Each structure stands twice: as C-alpha cells, then as structure tokens.
C-alpha cells in the first residue's frame, strides 16, 4: 500500500533542468497508476520557474511551495585567469583556507591534472570523476567529510547524494554551463557554517568545453533515425553490441539514444536486449532546438555573471526566478574586497612547464588480440589542444606550420628520461598519413637522429583506396573495420624493437592493427608513440 510518493531531485524530470535524466520521465507512468488519493511530493533545491512549471505539468502536482534560495554567509567572488595562473592561485591560497572544500572542473582530464599539480605542491588533494573506481569514490567522499584531505578536485560527478555540512569553500576552476549548475554546486559550501565562500574562475577553454556539452546533450537526429531503422530492419530482439556494429556512434551516444527511445516508447528493453515496438515515433527536432537555444542563453548568463558589477548573489537569485531577492552585502562587489590575484612569477613558469608535460600511457588493446601480436605499452606526449597539444592541433589545421623543434625535444625528453622503455627501441617508423605524411616523417627523422637510432622509410605503407578518416569512426566496431586490411608492412623490416609514431591517438586501433602485422613479421616489440591523445578531448 502506498502512503506517499516522494520524488527527490525532481528537476531531473524536466528537459529544461540542469541535470535532465530521461529515465526520470518514467515516473509519470508511476504517478498515473498510483491509487487514487495517494499524495505525490516532488522536491528540488535548485530550479527556475520554467523547470518548476515543467515538473508540475509532468507529475500533475496541484500546489507549489517555494522558499528563498539565498545562503546566508556564502561570500561569492569571480575573476578571469589563465591556465597556469589558476593552478598557482590554487596552490598558493588553498593552504591558507580553513577547513576543506571542493574545486569543480568541467572535464575528467582537468580533474586529474589539477589534483596532480596540487599534490606536487604538497597539498592533500584527490581527483573525483566517473572514471575513478566506483569502490574508491565513497572513500574519497568520507575522507573529505572527515577533513582528512584539503580538497577534492571534481567534475559534477560529485553531486547528487553528497552532503557535507562543513565545507568551507567551493572553487570553480572553470565556468559551468548555467546559473542552475553553478548555484547547485557552490551551494554545497557552508551548509552548517556561519561563513563560507565560493570563487568562480573563467578560463579561455570554458567556451569550447561548454559548447561541446550543449551540442551533445541530446542524441543526434540523423543517428537516432538510423538506429530506429536498424531496429525496424532487424525485426526482433537485438543486443547493444549489434547496435554498435550498425550505427557509427560512440558508446555513450548509443546508450543515450537507447535510453531516449525506450522512454519515448519507440523500442522496448528486456534484460540486455532491445526491439522495436508498434508505437509510431518521430524525432522531436523542434523541442531539441528550443532547449539548445535556451542552454545558449543560460551559458551567456554565466558570461554576464563574471562581468557583473553589482551584487553577485542578487544576480544569481534573479536568474533563478527567486521571489525573495536582496543584496547580500558580503560578495566582492558589495564589500569591495576582491581576490588577491598577485602571483609568484617563477611558480607560474613552473606551472606552464607542468601543463606542457601533459603526457600519458597508451595501454595496448588486449581483447581479441593474440598475446604474441600485442603492442607493448606506449606513450602520448600531450592532450589534444592542451599544452604541447596546441601545437599538434595547429599543424593538423595547417600542415605548412610543421611539427616544431620543441615537440622533438620534448618527445626525446619523455622517451629517454620519463619512459625509458626496455628493451629500448632500435629503429623508428611512422603510421602512413594522407594529410600529414611528409610532416610526420620529417618529425620522425629528427627524433630518430636525437635518439641515435635509424628511421626506416616505407616500412609501413597504405594500400590504395578511398579510406575514411579514422577520427570519423565513433566506436570500436567501425574503428577496427576502417583500418583492417588497410596497411602493408614490408617483409624485410628490422626485427628489433620499434618506436611507431603517429600524430594523434584516439581508439588505438591503427596502432593495434599495424602492431599486429609488425609482430607477425618478427619485430621483437612495438612501442606506440603519439604526439597527442584525442580520446575524450573533442
């Protein structure tokens, strides 16, 4: 027997909400089958009038109770700083703050990077995002609750369900998409403290990242229609791997499309299988355009916030349609007390070098690859569009620029001092490229000279054909098919360990397929090396 249905985080029901989750839409069906007279209570801490109206209509709520949003004692500040300057500001000021807090970032890569910098500066910090082991995340939360660590550097993955009554500060390393996103996160500070503060920084990379999130917040119309046609042609139950093999989209996008189609009744799911229903379906492109435009307006509002000369609290509350608004008297614009942005120049230089050394490991693909044909562990020099990856992006955009000496020297330093693979490479080869073949070869020749090993020209060639760029292949089924039977390895290549160079790595399938052929020719070890890692960097 149902006495009361409580829906927490009710903003997730609304397509206008900052954290819309399609599965929450199924609650409408639950409400409709409740016994007559069973009350429904929908709760949310952060929602503007549009979200409230949407939730009210969907759930069928008769009355609305709305309290004031302002958090007394929460001092707000905002400023613009470059990447290196933000790192230095954090490492300089965090040790002076009482208690513990959160630094919010937009991407998993930034969470890892900022946490690593803080650790190297002697600050107790942990990264927190969806790729952190699920068993480790509760441990990080508890250590933050117990104030055993100074700061957690987190994506919005540290969100719903986390309640720390004594957080002293919340700092945003980058600007979130909307006022609702921001207020939900900064509002975690000082819930049981008299005084707390929130600092928002705007960086040059914010716009590109937020635009990507907005553009990918809904499934792609063409891909969704393609998926529905696949289900119609299949005529029965299929698994997700079958969908991945048929629709050229990333796994995350496939999951999102499947969820939307199930909620919309276009397909049904039982266990791990899906099939088309008899229900009519069409892609609602009008609502997608409307919501996307609204998100652009919300992003513009956050740009205004950074430049706001009046009360910052008042600005946020008005944007959230709070009827109980007044000036706070304690934000930077009310008090006249602004952030101290003076920074130690040698430390900024150190941070700039740290950002350029944004390298990582290229783990070999193991599944379905025979053990004696697998690559060894490789390295990438940078993240796409970050640090030295900015130079790689410039060459991809304009090949005439060429890969400069700084990339050669940095690659040599990484290979000889940080990586030092054993047994060491005895020759160098490059992945054939239609667009950057000569530029990549010129880079490889200079690097080989610095490493004092030979560069073997034409060790690997590409068969004639009209091949699609690998970057357009969105999941492993398409990525592997696109490079299989595409390359030829010369039968008389050296048998010693090889440093196999490509400009950019994403899926690792190009390295994997060429590596398999090299190993079949008797090459002792294949070490992949890429100038930039583009995975997750779009």
Regions found by a protein language model. Give the residues of each.
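C-terminal accessory region of SF2 helicases/translocases
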Residues: 166, 171, 175-184, 190-388
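A short, structured active-site edge motif that brings together acidic residues
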Residues: 67-69, 130, 429-431, 455-468
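Active-site signature of alpha/beta-hydrolase-fold catalytic machinery across serine-
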Residues: 54, 442, 446, 513, ...
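Active-site-facing substrate-recognition patch
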Residues: 74, 348-427, 436-437, 441, ...
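Helicase motor core with emphasis on the C-terminal RecA-like subdomain
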Residues: 1-229, 241, 267-276
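Acidic, metal-coordinating catalytic cores used for nucleic-acid/nucleotide bond scission
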Residues: 108, 132, 429-440
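Acidic, divalent-metal-coordinating active-site segment for phosphoryl/phosphodiester hydrolysis
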Residues: 112, 504-514
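PRPP-dependent phosphoribosyltransferase catalytic core
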Residues: 335, 350, 354, 512-538
């Amino acid at each position: 027997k149902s006495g009361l249905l409580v829906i927490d985080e009710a903003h997730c029901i609304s397509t206008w909400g900052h954290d819309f989750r399609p599965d929450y839409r199924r609650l409408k069906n639950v409400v409709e089958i409740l016994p007559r007279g069973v009350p429904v209570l929908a709760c949310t801490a952060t929602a503007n009038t549009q979200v409230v109206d949407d939730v009210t209509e969907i759930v069928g709520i008769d009355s609305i109770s709305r309290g004031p949003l302002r958090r007394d004692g929460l001092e707000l500040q905002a400023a613009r700083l470059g990447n290196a300057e933000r790192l230095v500001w954090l490492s300089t000021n965090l040790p002076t703050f009482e208690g513990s807090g959160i630094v919010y970032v937009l991407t998993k890569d930034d969470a890892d990077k900022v946490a690593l910098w803080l650790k190297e500066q002697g600050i107790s910090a942990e990264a927190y995002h969806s790729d952190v082991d699920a068993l480790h995340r509760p441990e990080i939360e508890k250590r933050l609750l117990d104030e055993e660590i100074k700061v957690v550097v987190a994506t919005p993955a540290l969100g719903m369900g986390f309640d720390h009554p004594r957080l002293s500060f919340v700092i945003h390393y980058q600007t979130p998409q909307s006022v609702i996103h921001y207020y939900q996160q900064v509002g975690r500070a000082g819930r049981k403290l008299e005084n707390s503060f929130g600092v928002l920084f705007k960086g040059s990379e914010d716009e590109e990242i937020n635009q990507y999130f907005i553009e990918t917040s809904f499934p792609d119309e063409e891909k969704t229609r393609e998926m529905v046609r696949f289900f119609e042609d299949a005529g029965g139950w299929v698994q997700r791997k079958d969908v991945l093999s048929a629709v050229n989209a990333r796994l995350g996008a496939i999951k999102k499309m499947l969820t939307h189609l199930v909620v919309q009744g276009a397909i049904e799911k039982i266990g791990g299988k899906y099939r088309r229903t008899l229900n009519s379906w069409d892609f609602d492109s009008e609502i997608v355009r409307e919501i996307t435009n609204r998100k652009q307006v919300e992003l513009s509002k956050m740009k205004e916030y950074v430049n706001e000369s009046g009360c910052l609290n008042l600005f946020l509350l008005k944007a959230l349609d709070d009827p109980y608004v007044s000036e706070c008297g304690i934000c930077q614009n009310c008090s006249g007390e602004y952030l101290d942005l003076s920074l130690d120049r040698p430390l900024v230089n150190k941070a700039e070098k740290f950002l350029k050394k944004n390298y990582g490991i290229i783990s070999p693909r193991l599944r379905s690859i025979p053990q004696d044909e697998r690559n060894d562990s490789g390295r990438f020099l940078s993240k796409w569009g970050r640090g030295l990856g900015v130079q790689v992006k410039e060459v991809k955009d304009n090949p005439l620029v060429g890969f400069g000496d700084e990339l050669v020297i940095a690659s040599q330093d990484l290979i000889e001092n940080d990586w030092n693979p054993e047994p060491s490479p005895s020759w160098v080869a490059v992945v054939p490229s239609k667009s950057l073949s000569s530029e990549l070869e010129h880079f490889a020749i200079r690097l080989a000279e610095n490493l004092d090993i030979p560069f073997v020209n034409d060790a690997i060639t590409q068969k004639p054909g009209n091949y699609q760029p690998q970057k357009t292949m969105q999941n492993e089924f398409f990525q592997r098919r696109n490079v299989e039977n595409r390359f030829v390895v010369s039968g008389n290549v050296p048998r010693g360990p090889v440093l196999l160079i490509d400009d950019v790595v994403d899926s690792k399938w190009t390295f994997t397929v060429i590596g398999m052929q090299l190993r079949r020719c008797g090459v002792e070890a294949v070490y992949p090396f890429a100038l930039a890692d583009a995975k997750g960097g779009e």
